[in-house]
Amino acid sequence: MSDTDGKKTLGLRGGAPRPGNVKQSFSHGRTKNVVVETKRKRVVVPKAGATTSAGGKAPIGDPSRRPAGISDAEMERRLKAVKAAKAREAEEEAARIAEEKARAEERERRRAEQEERERAEREREESLKAKAEEDKRRKDEAEAAAKAAAAPAAEPVVQRPAAKAAPEPAPRKQQDRDRDNKRGGKGNDDSRRSGKLTLNQALAGGEGGRQRSMAAMKRKQERARQKAMGGQVEREKVVRDVQVPEAIVVSELANRMSEKVGEVVKALMNNGMMVTQNQAIDADTAELIVQEFGHRIVRVSDADVEDVIKEVEDDEADLKTRPPVVTIMGHVDHGKTSLLDAIRKAKVVAGEAGGITQHIGAYQVKTDSGQLLSFLDTPGHAAFTSMRSRGAQVTDIVVLVVAADDAVMPQTIEAINHAKAAEVPMIVAINKIDRPAADPTKVRTDLLQHEVIVEQMSGDVQDVEVSAITGQGLDDLLEAIALQAEILELKANPNRAAQGAVIEAQLDVGRGPVATVLVQNGTLRQGDIFVVGEQYGKVRALINDQGERVKEAGPSVPVEVLGLNGTPEAGDVLNVTSTEAQAREIASYRANAAKDKRAAAGAATTLEQLMANAKADEDVSELPILVKADVQGSAEAIVQAMEKIGNDEVRVRVLHSGVGAITETDVGLAEASGAPIMGFNVRANASARNTANQKGVELRYYSIIYDLVDDVKAAASGLLSAEIRENFIGYATIKEVFKVTGVGKVAGCLVTEGVARRSAGVRLLRDNVVIHEGTLKTLKRFKDEVAEVQSGQECGMAFENYDDIRADDVIEIFEREEITRTLT
């Protein structure tokens, strides 16, 4: 016994909980010892004799009830497994019953809470209603007391009981506390609100781990509240008024509708528009999308900024007579500029390259009678269609010049159409009347075909026979112009803000952007702030047609305007504004509107059109070029002429067109695209020339548009594939077929027509049907290889890689010729 003094013998522990310490680690090196209690589940197993007594079954060792081949140990093991399974089923059933009971209690608790809330809400509403009635009663009593003019009334008797009944919120707070206490640990939002800590929590990090945020708890409470109130209420669709301008970006449209960008893009694709969120669409497409999403569209326009330059009707008393604007039009080389020279007594033709007018010239002439006439001389070449159109739009009278020895030509017809479209009166000047081959009657007769009936043909169109060389009929022409101007009663108000049209624009090296403007109304003065197209500026200087500086220009006066911030387009309208801010805002709006429209036009392409264009471009060769010209009108005319060059196989693509000298930027663009640079009346600066020489960029200079168009047409013709043409040179008939070792079958032939050549192509005809086409392997005459065999001679022929030849077959000999094609 001495060995066991003070020691406990080994044995099994009871079912009491075993305490233990767990070391819990947190961030920043903090630790905490946590006491953890673990409880062992007690497995309830029936007693050993219970099964036998209850079921009346035989004992384990009863050989009569035991299956054959089963030992006692195996039988005992099976019985224990059955007992354990039954015990587990009993535990699971008990757990299920407990869980259902807990769920029922939870439902009951929530129902009680809901009823409590409804009761509290009813009490609050009743309290508010009673308070309102009490206030109304007091007000009525006060009014009655005031009417009776009695002494100051004492406090209402019912005020004290009301004061006693007032503290209503106190029981409600107590009820809320009681309800919170009833919820217990299971109804709490998070386990961190309880004081217990389980083993899993301690091992997983416990309180030091990631906790649920207050926002998550609030969301959970909100979901529970909505669930208790009968489920989430479906949010109603908000119908908005969506403002849509002329062009809008897809993402901006989605933002204004408060819709997802992806949904808007999907709707556009369903309507056949392959666009992204950064592309712009037009207003009509945007309206369809807005209506599809159930919103209301409000069409707006950014053009409100242009209200300050809207045309104002002038009073009749302010209008004064102005000089007429006369445009001289006609076919090339019919003497338009020479006629104007004779009127102005100057030499304009000498200043034009090749004697061809390539700009719109604006001049003012004073007649012998003292009357002022403003003349516009338009080009007659086919490339300057847009210039003639602009000249017809700003003019009052059109003088149609027709050569008496050439009659009506294509540009003459075009000028007639421009005049009719602009609805301006016409005067026919039959020029070159001094020529021996002049036939003015033929001119008048030809004009009848185009609905131009002159006075000598009982019409209302004046016609004058003139000669720019001898001066014959010039006075009659000026008299006819003055008469027509008197009939039109041309008037304008000089005492208002100026308005005019840009006839021509160019980028001058020393003076910057220069615009030739024909003032149509008002007076343009030095220092005026103006907007013209997408550009704006302040009038720095005004130069008239004589090259002299002037302070102002009235109606129908052509002047050159200096002081623009950029080169405007020919045909733009000039308007004077009161402030520079207005001019800048209008110019910015116009530039953005033009850019948005170009983007919207490019985006409005369906997938089928994209695929069709891509397939068409595969078979078309392109000649890229860059165009730089001295004035905007010439650049525009060259671009239009380039667009007309080409066919289904080749076309000319103008990568860039601009005004001014050729710069290094142009050379860089030309090098990247492998394009030549065409300079029309401009030259490259020194740095651009050096860069072009280093990078191998071709620079071409022109002063006559004929030469430029012809050179580009010749270069484009070089991209055309050559035409293959077959020329038949002879026929031969096979008389007999021989077999030669090392060669194969050889045809003994008689050349019946033409000549047979070794280098030519051959076809084998059998019963007039082509059965083979190829080349000759050998051509022999008397065992000698020959280059050709003349008609009537015999020879031997062997085909390359073909042996199926028979007697009486016919051999057709031909040669292929490549013919260079040109563009017409």
Curated annotation (Swiss-Prot):
Corresponding gene?
infB
Q: Which compartments is it annotated to reside in? A: Cytoplasm
Instruction: Cite the record's Basic and acidic residues compositional bias ranges.
Output: 86-144, 170-193
Function, as annotated: One of the essential components for the initiation of protein synthesis. Protects formylmethionyl-tRNA from spontaneous hydrolysis and promotes its binding to the 30S ribosomal subunits. Also involved in the hydrolysis of GTP during the formation of the 70S ribosomal complex.
Q: Which family does it belong to?
A: Belongs to the TRAFAC class translation factor GTPase superfamily. Classic translation factor GTPase family. IF-2 subfamily.
Q: Where is this region: G1?
A: 330-337
> What is the name listed in the Swiss-Prot or TrEMBL entry for this protein?
Translation initiation factor IF-2
Annotated region (G5) at 467-469
State if Lyase is listed as a keyword: no
Concerning Pfam families, the annotation shows: EF-G_D2, GTP_EFTU, IF-2, IF2_assoc, IF2_N
